[in-house]
């Protein structure tokens, strides 16, 4: 039986390279993983006062994470770190206090950015280890660079052999990591 993986992408751009990379991951993922993108672009900015109200977008995202066996966070690099959109989703799912739905779910990290920098995933590791998140984090990540230098073609297909290899290695290792839980 395959593991259900909630994929949270920290970009809602219609031309998001992160979405294109996830589409590629979905096409190459081992049968042991079922990658499901959880849309977070419509989430209102987290506000603890809203925890007492019915916010359909909060409920939808929380339920999707709750129903998953594992999680992958995918982010562009914004000013040397992860995106505000991803951070907002992390906050929404980790609240109300004491009711975090992240706890114990094996986490994979990926970033698609201009340089291939690991800075966003390094910062996310710290968050994932926090008391309200407490996720086992894969000891590797997928960092894909060259997005403005031909990694993707005009049809949105990943054509960089290096990036393809990075993502293939990541998803195979992540499947092995998730199988331990």
What do the predicted segments below correspond to?
Residues 53-131:
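Helix-loop-strand module that forms the ligand-binding subsite of alpha/beta enzymes
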Residues 18, 22, 58, 86, ...:
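A general structural signal for well-ordered alpha-helical segments in protein cores
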Residues 40-56, 151:
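N-terminal beta-loop-helix "entrance" segment that forms/cooperates
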Residues 36-44, 141-148:
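Short connector loops at secondary-structure junctions
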Residues 134-181:
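Glycine-rich phosphate/pyrophosphate-binding loop and the adjoining helix
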Residues 9, 39, 111:
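Short beta-strand/turn micro-motifs composed of small residues
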Residues 30-36, 133-135:
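A generic structural motif
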Residues 2-32:
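N-terminal beta1-alpha1 ligand-phosphate binding loop
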């Amino acid at each position: 039986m395959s593991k259900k993986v909630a994929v949270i992408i920290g970009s809602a751009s219609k031309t998001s390279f992160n979405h294109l990379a996830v589409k590629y991951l979905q096409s190459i993922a081992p049968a042991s993983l079922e990658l499901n993108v959880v849309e977070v672009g419509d989430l209102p900015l987290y506000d603890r006062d809203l925890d007492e109200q019915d916010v359909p977008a909060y409920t939808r995202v929380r339920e999707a994470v709750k129903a998953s066996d594992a999680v992958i966070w995918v982010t562009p690099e914004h000013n040397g770190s992860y995106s505000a959109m991803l951070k907002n989703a992390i906050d929404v799912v980790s609240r109300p206090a004491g009711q975090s739905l992240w706890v114990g779910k094996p986490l994979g990290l990926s970033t698609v950015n201009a340089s291939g920098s690991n800075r966003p995933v390094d910062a996310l590791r710290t968050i994932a280890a926090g008391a309200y998140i407490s996720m086992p984090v894969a000891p590797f990540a997928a960092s894909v660079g060259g997005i403005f230098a031909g990694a993707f073609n005009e049809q949105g297909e990943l054509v960089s052999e290096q990036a393809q290899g990075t993502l293939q290695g990541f998803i195979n290792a992540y499947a092995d990591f998730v199988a331990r839980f």
